Amino acid sequence: MSADMSFFHLISGASLVVQLVMLLLLTVSMVSWTMIFRRRSVLQQARIAADEFEDRFWSGGDLATLFREVTAQSEHAIGMAGIFQSGFNEFARLRKQPGADPRAVVEGAQRVMRVALSREMDDLETHLSFLATVGSTSPYVGLFGTVWGIMNSFRGLGTANQATLQMVAPGIAEALIATAMGLFAAIPAVIAYNRYSNDVERLINRYDNFLEEFSTILQRQAHV
């Protein structure tokens, strides 16, 4: 209990600038943790959805039937299902045109799927740049608070008749808390950014591989 009181006493006794730095780092840390948990849920759902759709796609069923099933679930599907939905819809539309060139039909479907893939990339990478920024800047913000606090401590020595450790220790301790809070905000953000960036890259590779495989299937169907 005394340690907790001492900790909060140091924070309450810090200078206004150091307190503002601590408040900023605490706020950033809370926002960062919120985004970490949200991104974890989003990426986990995206992996599960991709697994389920691939099972349905490669089950050997009719593509038109699969398209109707996907569209019945959502007119604007996301993930791998969204890429399939966009591509097959464009393929069917272009193929109905009189005198449609099979190559042009497939290329049109590929362009639409590339656009859908780009949208999925943007959605998957949402908030990752924020985590990267938190991870790279928080230690420096904390260091700024530490330097400011130490400057105040040594400034106080200038007006003292006798310099003692007891006089500067509280100021240095409260200043170092800012550095600790900066690291507390930065370390989880860096770990999450590296982990989620890897997860996003693997998902995008899966989407891209599916796009190429689906394009090959459409090429065969276009010449039927």
Locate the predicted segments by residue.
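Hydrophobic membrane-targeting segments
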Residues: M1-D55
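Residue-level signal for the membrane-embedded core of alpha-helical transmembrane segments
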Residues: V21-V31, S138-V141, G145-W148, L183
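Alpha-helical transmembrane segments of multi-pass inner-membrane proteins
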Residues: L23-L24, A169, I177, M181
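Alpha-helical transmembrane segments of multi-pass membrane proteins
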Residues: L25-V28, V190, N194
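Predominantly long cytosolic amphipathic alpha-helical stalk/bundle segments
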Residues: I48-V141, I150-T164, I191-V224
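Hydrophobic alpha-helical transmembrane segments and adjacent short intramembrane/lumenal linkers
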Residues: N161-A175
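Hydrophobic alpha-helical transmembrane segments of polytopic membrane proteins
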Residues: A175-I191
